[in-house]
Amino acid sequence: AYQVLRDPASKKIKIAITYTNRAAEEITNRLEGMNIDQSSIWAGTIHQFCMHFIIRPYAMYSKRLCKGYRIIDDYSKKAYGREIAERLGMHLNYYDDPFQYENVRTEYKRVLKEKKEIDFDAILLISEELLASCAFIGSNIASVISSILVDEFQDTNELQYSILSTIYKANKSIILMFVGDVNQAIYSSLGGVAKGKKELETLYEINFDSLSLKGCYRSTQRLVD
């Protein structure tokens, strides 16, 4: 909201990266309640960001995607995992994760390529590959962005940090903001890395200002006490 009000004439995009769709909707609803013009605001998850700004516009530059692709959801991924494990003669119980086995992971990746399908993990991997192999992609994206806000950054993984870093370094006039609490990291088991201020400064080659919120805006003071 501040970025829009600070320069209302700017057509450059203000990016808000959230961890869930619900969080993105909450941002949109709050801005709507404040009567903020949202025409230059984009809010969504990192996977949605990669699809919107990298995969869809630049799929033709990916050997894997240039002849078409289909995105599968987590339900389909789990079904594939079970089918592959069964085909490999593995006897798993209901709670076993077939993807803990390397041979299942290898066959799963082969099947996806054969069927011209990608999952959520592949969205990030291919996005990073495109940014690394085609520098102009990062430059093009960075040229239309004025700011990037990452919410709950403590749950961001290394691949996501890398994607955002590449885009930022293509245009260091972009305003960067990471919001979160390293003490509330809950997705470390899924690869989330709660980087400290110094680590972020090293990765993004920028000096960050650190600000702390002293109050609690989710609970009553009685509950906090």
Model-derived segments and spans:
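DNA-processing P-loop NTPase/helicase core
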Residues: 60-66, 177
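Conserved Walker B
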Residues: 148-156, 182-183
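Hydrophobic "anchor" residues on beta-strands that sit immediately upstream
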Residues: 41, 147-150, 177
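Conserved catalytic network of the ASCE P-loop NTPase/AAA+ motor domain
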Residues: 6-9, 36, 139-141, 168-172, ...
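P-loop NTPase Walker
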Residues: 1-61
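Alpha-helical scaffold elements adjacent to nucleotide-binding pockets in ATP/GTP-utilizing enzyme cores
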Residues: 26-31, 49-53, 144, 159, ...
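Conserved RecA-like helicase ATPase core segment
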Residues: 163-225
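Accessory N-terminal region flanking or inserted into the helicase ATPase core
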Residues: 15, 73-149, 158-163, 188-196
